[in-house]
From Swiss-Prot:
E.C. no: 2.4.2.9
CDD domains: PRTases_typeI
Keywords on record: Allosteric enzyme, Glycosyltransferase, GTP-binding, Magnesium, Nucleotide-binding, Transferase
Gene name of the encoded protein: upp
Activity regulation statement: Allosterically activated by GTP.
Catalysed reaction equations from the record: UMP + diphosphate = 5-phospho-alpha-D-ribose 1-diphosphate + uracil
Gene3D superfamilies recorded: 3.40.50.2020
Biological function: Catalyzes the conversion of uracil and 5-phospho-alpha-D-ribose 1-diphosphate (PRPP) to UMP and diphosphate.
Protein's name in the database: Uracil phosphoribosyltransferase
Binding site for uracil: I194, G199, D200, A201
Length: 209
């Protein structure tokens, strides 16, 4: 069964407070999301394998460690997931980036797929699926399914916030996928929105309504 990790690092929680604040403007919101994504990436990559090497310093030769060649891929769910990609890439600049486009039908709350573009060698990569909000779990489920269908075997899901209902849906459908969060919120309301939430992440990132 996939694990759920909620990061309680003080910097993440401090910045998340201002991300939630309805008075935070688009520019600051975008910058805060970028910063939290970078901090979360630091935690998510904590278990990456390393290998021993020797490096020549200006003084002598020192035993050191480098990443053991593990390939990573980032797959934001369009469009809100785009707001977190640059923050992650600051720590993992060599990661390839794919995209999955989904929108939520306002009547059924179910996701509709309209775009999928992934790295050609996705089956060789550990994939981090990125979406700021995990609400009903439908979009994450469909995105993960689309990625698995194209050959990915190792997948993690990274979100700023989630509702317990959405987490359970993803865990049931994809028990092999670990979920990483900055916060677990209380619940979904009758319209499928996360409470207390942070509003519509895509609109707040891109200044749209």
């Amino acid at each position: 069964m996939g694990n759920v990790f909620v990061f309680d690092h003080p910097l993440i929680q401090h910045k998340l407070t201002y991300i939630r604040d309805k008075n935070t403007g688009t520019k600051e919101f975008r910058e805060l999301v970028d910063e939290v994504a970078m901090l979360m990436a630091f935690e998510i990559t904590r278990d990456l394998p390393v290998k021993e090497v020797n490096v020549d310093t200006p003084v002598t030769t020192a035993p050191s460690k480098v990443l053991a060649g593990k390939k990573l891929g980032l797959v934001p769910i369009l469009r809100a997931g785009l707001g977190m990609v640059d923050g992650v890439r600051k720590l993992i600049p060599a990661a390839k980036v794919g995209h999955v486009g989904l929108y939520r039908d306002p009547e059924t709350f179910k996701p509709v797929e309209y775009y999928v573009k992934l790295p050609n060698d996705i089956e060789e990569r550990e994939i981090i699926v990125i979406d700021p909000m995990l609400a009903t779990g439908g979009s994450a489920n469909d995105a993960i399914a689309a990625i698995k269908k194209r050959g990915a075997k190792n997948i993690r899901l990274m979100c700023l916030i989630a509702a317990p209902e959405g987490v359970e849906v993803v865990k049931e459908a994809h028990p092999d996928v670990d979920i990483y969060l900055a916060a677990m919120d209380e619940r979904l309301d009758d319209h499928g929105y996360i409470i207390p939430g942070l509003g519509d992440a895509g609109d707040r990132l891109f200044g749209t309504k």
